[in-house]
Amino acid sequence: MFHLRLVPDNTKIPFMNGRFAGLITSAFLSIASIILFFHPGLNYGIDFQGGIVIEARTPQAADFVSLRHSLGGLGMGQVALQEFGSPQDVLIRLERQPGDDAAQQVAADKVRATLAETLPGTQVRRVEAVGASVSAELFANGMLAMGLAMVAMLLYIWFRFEWQFGLGAVVTLLLDITKIIGFYAVTGMQFNLTAIAAILTIMGYSINDKVVVYDRMRENLRIYKKMPLRDLIDLSINETLNRTLGTSMCTFLSVIPLALIGGEALQDFGIVLLLGVFIATTSSIFIAAPILLFLGENRLRRGTPEAAGPGNPATTP
């Protein structure tokens, strides 16, 4: 059976030679991202800054392309469209307009008129202004979701492996997330509930990649008791390199269409996922692994049963 090999089986790349460069680069980018988070800050979407919510039903399946074009030309800032329920039901969200409640009503009336002109027969079923308190609650819930996901992953790694692996995984995840947030700050892309979904997806992908590498490290710790930890980590990464690169490449290729032709709703999501796949893959090699090396092999090897390996050959009865 044919097996695709992106790298030869006996590859021996000394990844740990680049551990300092990897950690320093990662720390620099994460610190810069934190600074950018505070200044100039994130471009919060309608979900997190309030706005106007309009529910409408079109006579036929909604034409989202025409609606985006028509509503986007009103000059009212961000306009988000979402299908809910049937294909005829449309949820329209506008950013909050300058002024008081009367200004919000004027904006809603403009949307009504545009809907009637673009898709005659459309019924507006609900108009509601989303205040700052609701938006703040959505933002808090999004942050809570990321925090709970982080804790759950820490506990999973901690119980499946040892605390050193859990610490390395969580520190690496934090560095990964800060870079993604910095990307949002630099590009000015909307930070909304879709952004939260993208970050959670990247977190899941990243931890899965690290579990594969960590599992091989744990296995090799039991097999090669006398091998220096630095060499063992390099060996483990090289042994899983085909799997890591293959998974990353397949994920990357599957997300490219979202980033290129996903439309307004999915394009930002796809772009962030592409960046996240790259960050997660490189961090498994140049961040998570060096953290284990710095924790020291005495802690990692403690309690590991003796096994055959270089310098510790198996004995036969």
Predicted regions and their residues:
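A structural signal for conserved, well-ordered secondary-structure elements
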Residues: 1-317
